[in-house]
Amino acid sequence: GQEYIQTANEEFHTDLVEFYEEYMAATENNKDLNESKFALDNKRARGFFTLLEKLEERPEAINAVKGQITGPITFATGVKDQNKKAIFYEEQIRDAAVKHLGLIAAWQTEQLSKYNLPVIVFFDEPALAGFGSSEFISISKKEVMDCFSEVNEYVQQRGALTGIHVCANADWSIILDSETNILSFDAYSFFDKLLIFSDSLQNFLQKGGQIAWGIVPTQEKEDIDRENIDNLYSRFTEQLEQLAKDTNLSKQSILRQIYITPSCGTGSLDRERAEKVLSLTRGVSDKIRSELIL
């Protein structure tokens, strides 16, 4: 069966008080996050510690390093209480969940900052695809943006950039109108849906926002098998042309504010396809650098 949080008993309320004490110690009394409950361990975050090991080897030509964590909306709408009600709807528990995720992201930022490279932390928000649907009818845009504002702050005040990744279609204005630095989206499948928000996109880019342009497919194996660098490059150039036209911004200014990325993660793919996705990403990026950037 599905696990849930038992919010009705006394033990939960004791735990909640303890959580806020730990939170206050970390945020107001400068307790070292590494000594707090917000520090991850190898059992909970094996991939993160593998990344740190690789960074210790100081491989050449790294320009930045990126962490990732479940976003507050996806977490708080996915975790339920004993009545199968999402904890997002319980204001006190939602507040604790947002602070919990924000401080784990802050801990990640501190760990990644040791390598003297620019740090980016992404919040993964697949649930945003459901915003505005009947399932989330009572959740307001302001509530969502307040959650983003808080988690962004924990990371940004430590000198890192934040991103929000959604691998489906979404109301992109929520991210574009927030203080998030980077919008990460599946440009392979949903580019036309993003263009609907051209005004928000223009404002976002003009205030220095960046786009992680997921032009390399990861969702359908047939797409991965079929695609090559030239196809994806020409798809990208068409999209760039369209974005420049719709936002009234120059292609060169847009090119300075984008990253070429896979459309989503490769964790569900076999190794051969995962490696192809990464080499396509590198190949498309190199081709754009050599042929488009002045």
Across the structure, where does each feature detected by a protein language model lie?
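Alpha-helical structural signal in soluble globular domains
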Residues: 54, 111, 150, 154-158, ...
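Short helix-terminating capping/connector loops at secondary-structure junctions
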Residues: 59-63, 113-118, 157, 206, ...
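Short, solvent-exposed loop/turn segments at secondary-structure junctions
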Residues: 72-74, 128, 218, 265
